[in-house]
Amino acid sequence: MLRGQEERKYSIRKYSIGVVSVLAATMFVVSSHEAQASEKTSTNAAAQKETLNQPGEQGNAITSHQMQSGKQLDDMHKENGKSGTVTEGKDTLQSSKHQSTQNSKTIRTQNDNQVKQDSERQGSKQSHQNNATNNTERQNDQVQNTHHAERNGSQSTTSQSNDVDKSQPSIPAQKVIPNHDKAAPTSTTPPSNDKTAPKSTKAQDATTDKHPNQQDTHQPAHQIIDAKQDDTVRQSEQKPQVGDLSKHIDGQNSPEKPTDKNTDNKQLIKDALQAPKTRSTTNAAADAKKVRPLKANQVQPLNKYPVVFVHGFLGLVGDNAPALYPNYWGGNKFKVIEELRKQGYNVHQASVSAFGSNYDRAVELYYYIKGGRVDYGAAHAAKYGHERYGKTYKGIMPNWEPGKKVHLVGHSMGGQTIRLMEEFLRNGNKEEIAYHKAHGGEISPLFTGGHNNMVASITTLATPHNGSQAADKFGNTEAVRKIMFALNRFMGNKYSNIDLGLTQWGFKQLPNESYIDYIKRVSKSKIWTSDDNAAYDLTLDGSAKLNNMTSMNPNITYTTYTGVSSHTGPLGYENPDLGTFFLMATTSRIIGHDAREEWRKNDGVVPVISSLHPSNQPFVNVTNDEPATRRGIWQVKPIIQGWDHVDFIGVDFLDFKRKGAELANFYTGIINDLLRVEATESKGTQLKAS
């Protein structure tokens, strides 16, 4: 009997030790997984979640083993009861409970320490960890009465696992960002605790930066300034270097845009007109409201001041253009005058001499606007030997006087003509005033001066403000001049209705004059040896004289547009780009091989450095995304890459690269700027009145 009881006791101990050994091995495996998860915490965010979930998983594993061991103990208790040894089994169970209670407290303390370490490692995800820890503690509490016996052999193993965790470097402030977050640095709604947020902001700011070649030295939009008060004004009395050109070049804002070949060009033009450009300014919304297409019953034009377009050398417009001569403003790509009028703008194209000097053209422009018979001035006529009076203009604005202004837009030589006319209006012609005092008689109001506030803005397109080597080395040579004057002589026959602009020199056959007599008379004209013509005025010397004659008006907004259609060859010279108008290939190479490197880049006829601004007058660089409303200073727009001299007016019918929609956008943008000039002026008037 006693021997049987001893065997049963031995069996109970054997089973208890076996169960404890199994559970100890299980806890060792679980603790190993827990240590591995701790090592992965500092490098992988996904591993953090696994580490957070492991206490709960550990508890679940313990619970299953504890339930199995509990069942085995119950079976043993039943066997002991049947054999009469229940008392000893209970003693053993109570002893086991006492030990397991102490072990449970120790393990819970260790788990709490481990949770604190995990909480420190998580940083910004502490709240999530606390929730996971609380879940683990609740699971441990549920099984604390059943897993005590099995923990005896696992205490040392758990202690070793905690030692491994403590040996790992603690990184409480480091946050691991998932890869999908880094893939979107410009997200507008990043997490508040994401350290990539500042980078995202910088990335967004970088997208709004201006082109590196665009210098923004302007004052806030719509601010009226005087050139003398502008700290950013730079006098360009020193000749600009080649580096000065690169800062103007606008490669990003090239007008060329990818166009679907199947898209109707007329529809593109219509879209451009229906949705005029809106500049990216703080007042863009208010400005956009001022620019709207013509409504069905609208009679009042959208612009307050008429816009007058002035053609350049060789330009013929309106009824004065031959049948095969292209439409000067826009060609067949975009008929600028016609389309802008359809949109409700008051625009006009002036008709002045195609071969005349800037002086004669400026006088003609005045009478084109004001109306009346052209008076070139007694002093000027006597000095150069041509007739004083010319043709008579009807006038587009007979009441033109100070306070009633116009906008002037000139292409090529037209920009020079505009500047000289405005100078005469404001300061008069000293030679004519002196001649009038000495000889009496009549004097044109244009020459008396004192007519300020009659021009709101001056905009020049590819204008040779500083001249062109093409005129010096080609256009103003004796051979070319003879060809030009011979053409005028031929077109002056009595059967021709085309006026090339030299009638004041006698290039018009009289009604009763034979053609032979007409040829003899014209051959004696002083024009053959005179400098009072376009060929000379476009030279470097002729343009320099004009620059010295003109000054800046602090009440006028000045803007220039420049194109470049040349590239640097292997020897450092400029060659015409492919697609440059074929008639300008020779002149482009003449300019591109100039001895001065800064004078080589060109649009086929005009060097870039000449088109930017007059060399002796103040200027400031502006971007395409800001309103050009400053006064008393040349606002230099970024150079347009790939535009040659005639791309500004669209007459190159062989250039299929330049679309009518481009011209529509270009001229609509100019009109928008002119409307903003008017808005700025009205605002200034209201402020003065208040």
Swiss-Prot record:
Family annotation (SUPFAM superfamilies): alpha/beta-Hydrolases
Highest taxon of the lineage: Bacteria
Keywords, ordered alphabetically: Calcium, Hydrolase, Lipid degradation, Lipid metabolism, Metal-binding, Secreted, Signal, Zymogen
Subcellular location: Secreted
Keyword Membrane assigned: no
Residues reported in the UniProt entry to bind Ca(2+): G579, D644, D647, D652, D655
Broad class of where this protein is predominantly found: secreted
InterPro entries in the cross-refs: AB_hydrolase_fold, Lip-like_C, YSIRK_signal_dom
Enzyme class (EC, first level): hydrolase
NCBIfam families: lipase_YSIRK_Sa, YSIRK_signal
More info: The expression of Staphylococcus lipase is negatively regulated by bacteriophage lysogenization (lipase conversion).
UniProt protein name: Lipase 2
Organism field: Staphylococcus aureus
